[in-house]
Amino acid sequence: MASKILLNVQEEVTCPICLELLTEPLSLDCGHSLCRACITVSNKEAVTSMGGKSSCPVCGISYSFEHLQANQHLANIVERLKEVKLSPDNGKKRDLCDHHGEKLLLFCKEDRKVICWLCERSQEHRGHHTVLTEEVFKECQEKLQAVLKRLKKEEEEAEKLEADIREEKTSWKYQVQTERQRIQTEFDQLRSILNNEEQRELQRLEEEEKKTLDKFAEAEDELVQQKQLVRELISDVECRSQWSTMELLQDMSGIMKWSEIWRLKKPKMVSKKLKTVFHAPDLSRMLQMFRELTAVRCYWVDVTLNSVNLNLNLVLSEDQRQVISVPIWPFQCYNYGVLGSQYFSSGKHYWEVDVSKKTAWILGVYCRTYSRHMKYVVRRCANRQNLYTKYRPLFGYWVIGLQNKCKYGVFEESLSSDPEVLTLSMAVPPCRVGVFLDYEAGIVSFFNVTSHGSLIYKFSKCCFSQPVYPYFNPWNCPAPMTLCPPSS
């Protein structure tokens, strides 16, 4: 009912010329109203064609343009009508034209909007291309489906990019955490190295202090004894000086002889300067050594000892990681040592050996250069020095060794028949030795793990014609020689 009333009101305020709601309505003498623009155009046409007379387009009654009056009341009604909205529960609202109340059955291509048949005839849409809404609906549906498909594809791409970003973020955070741990580990190790160096320097200073103070104490004791002796002589001489002439003359030779013989023995001079003078360690060099050791430790392999063809004087542990040399009385053994169970014919490999309690040892790698095999030999007498010269590259040994508790040596890579042992200088005696093999490059390197990975010696341009075996020789020292498990 309300909708019908609104439609009736809308008809009353619709311009009979443009068929739109009145805009700036002007009332004629007959009572009808027109838009100011429409009546102005109509008046101009009348002046031109009818000799200046104008008539109402509704009833035909003539009017004078000068007598037209603005109808504010109708203008207010039009404004209120534009503000009126039909209730949402009216299902036909969307299908009806807001201006004419007719069904929206047409689509204007120029204005891209749905219109009714009256809108099509209005001045606003006159001459425009219109089609039925059913025809354009299918086209819109196809376009919407295409847009929907593209948007879903964009959504999938966005989700994929989001997942990639999350994965990259996780990977980045892991890299940062790994790098943080690596930095902390390296600095912890550097601090450990510095602490060890500090303790070593303090221990050296303490040992020198003890030795020097012992010398001072010995000198003081000696001077105390001499001072006591000279006091006794002085007392004796003073006492004799009080004797009578006969007493003094009868015993004069004895006291004079002692007085002439005795001389003050000066103690040995003790150096006023410290032998141990601390110099700050070269941190860059220490860091370089540490990094070199860390680099080769990446190739750490689990090496065990081979019990095949084992010499009689050698005993292996159950886990085949430790070898001990035992005496076979009354014989002395030509100790050929023991090979590793693993052999290498390519690649890079690293292992570590604990020799902390030994006073003699040999270790490195062995490569069979001839058809020689490891055999045990027991002899009543053996020249150890001559035996020691057998451990050289000419016979397939690339090794270093310790003899007589403090003499470290290595045979240079000379093929001469009379090689010389190269003496190695060790600032810190190695308790743990690392061995690195690069088969293709022909390199065998030895590292002093005890001294933060300092390089002991490096064989280069080694010629390996056969597989290479780790080699261990405890010599005649009964202390154990132990293979360290990886990363221990």
Curated annotation (Swiss-Prot):
Q: What transmembrane ranges does the database entry give?
A: none
In terms of Pfam families, this protein maps to: SPRY (PF00622), zf-B_box (PF00643), zf-C3HC4_4 (PF15227)
Protein localization: Cytoplasm; Mitochondrion
> Where Zn(2+) is bound, by residue?
97, 100, 119, 125
Keyword presence, Signal: no
| Annotated Gene3D superfamilies | 2.60.120.920, Classic Zinc Finger (3.30.160.60), Zinc/RING finger domain, C3HC4 (zinc finger) (3.30.40.10)
Which stretches does the record call B box-type zinc fingers? 92-134
Enzyme Commission designation:
2.3.2.27
Q: Which residues form a coiled coil?
A: 131-239
Which pathway does this polypeptide act in? Protein modification; protein ubiquitination
The record's section on InterPro entries has: B30.2/SPRY (IPR001870), B30.2/SPRY_sf (IPR043136), Butyrophylin_SPRY (IPR003879), ConA-like_dom_sf (IPR013320), SPRY_dom (IPR003877), TRIM/RBCC (IPR050143), TRIM34_PRY/SPRY (IPR035826), Znf_B-box (IPR000315)
| Zinc finger feature spans (RING-type) | 15-60
Which EC class, in a word? transferase
Instruction: State the reactions this protein catalyses.
Output: S-ubiquitinyl-[E2 ubiquitin-conjugating enzyme]-L-cysteine + [acceptor protein]-L-lysine = [E2 ubiquitin-conjugating enzyme]-L-cysteine + N(6)-ubiquitinyl-[acceptor protein]-L-lysine
**Keyword Metal-binding on this protein?**
yes
Q: What Gene Ontology cellular component terms go with this record?
A: cytoplasm; cytosol; mitochondrion
Q: Which UniProt keywords apply?
A: Antiviral defense, Coiled coil, Cytoplasm, Metal-binding, Mitochondrion, Repeat, Transferase, Ubl conjugation pathway, Zinc, Zinc-finger
**Domain B30.2/SPRY: residue ranges:** 283-488
GO function term, MF aspect, one: identical protein binding
SMART domains per UniProt: BBOX (SM00336), RING (SM00184), SPRY (SM00449)
Q: Name one GO biological process term.
A: innate immune response
Subunit composition?
Homotrimer. Interacts (via B-box and SPRY domain) with TRIM5. (Microbial infection) Interacts (via the B30.2/SPRY domain) with HIV-1 capsid complexes.
Q: What family does the Swiss-Prot or TrEMBL record give for this protein?
A: Belongs to the TRIM/RBCC family.
Q: What does this protein do?
A: Functions as antiviral protein and contributes to the defense against retroviral infections. Acts as a capsid-specific restriction factor with the help of TRIM5 and prevents infection from non-host-adapted retroviruses. During influenza A virus infection, promotes programmed cell death by targeting ZBP1 for 'Lys-63'-linked polyubiquitination. In turn, promotes ZBP1 recruitment of RIPK3 to mediate virus-induced programmed necrosis. Negatively regulates the function of mitochondria by enhancing mitochondrial depolarization leading to cytochrome c release and mitochondria-dependent apoptosis.
Q: What is this protein called?
A: E3 ubiquitin-protein ligase TRIM34
**Species per Swiss-Prot/TrEMBL record:** Homo sapiens
Source lineage:
Eukaryota, Metazoa, Chordata, Craniata, Vertebrata
